[in-house]
Amino acid sequence: MNLSSCYLEDTELPFIGYDYYPTGLGTYVEYQVDSVWQDDQIGPIGSAEAHYFLRDVNESSFVDEEGRPAIRVERYSKQNQLGGFSNIKDIWYRTRTSKIAEQNEENVVFIKHNFPVKEGKTWDGNSKNTLQTLQLIYRQTNIPKVWDYEYKNVHEPYTINGFTFDSTITVLQLDRTATLGLSVFAQEVYAKGIGLVHKQLNVIDIQLPTFGDPFDTDTFGFQYEMVVTDFGQ
């Protein structure tokens, strides 16, 4: 009897989930981005909106400082749907190892995935960041240092912006709700063979004012959403 062949036939190998974070060169995903910023303490001018479009392209490969294969991601932007993408907004870097997927966003590194993908699995997505870095990028002094990312709705279908994806995973990064104080909701959805298709990031701080009506509140924070509009190679 060939024991190795019996093992292969009778044992179900674990699903790793690399397909949810593709690294193939030339692949791209396009997004519509909507964001709202608010700061009640500076009066009527304390709010703004931004609406634009992004195209993320896995442009080339290289070896990073730790000797790992990595991807250079060119992020193009435009203000409306007309015309093509010609303006490079950012250069990011992606590294996918056998155990994790990292994304370097202007020298801020997030652990986007922890393999193998499994329902309910958790990890600290900010393990490579300092509290000072998080306070700076989110503009909140009381932002938590540890964000326990969690896999939810693993291999479930997902519909967004007219697309229906057969197999997706949701990464709930943080869900902290407060009537007063800091509320944070951060979540990303990844489709198999495509990558990120929906991102939500809401960071809102509601405080009682130092002066004035004690029943009034001041709001400071932002809401940010990315929704897939196209993808391919």
Regions found by a protein language model. Give the residues of each.
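Conserved functional acidic sites
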Residues: 7-233
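C-terminal motif of bacterial Sec signal peptides marking the signal peptidase cleavage site
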Residues: 2-5
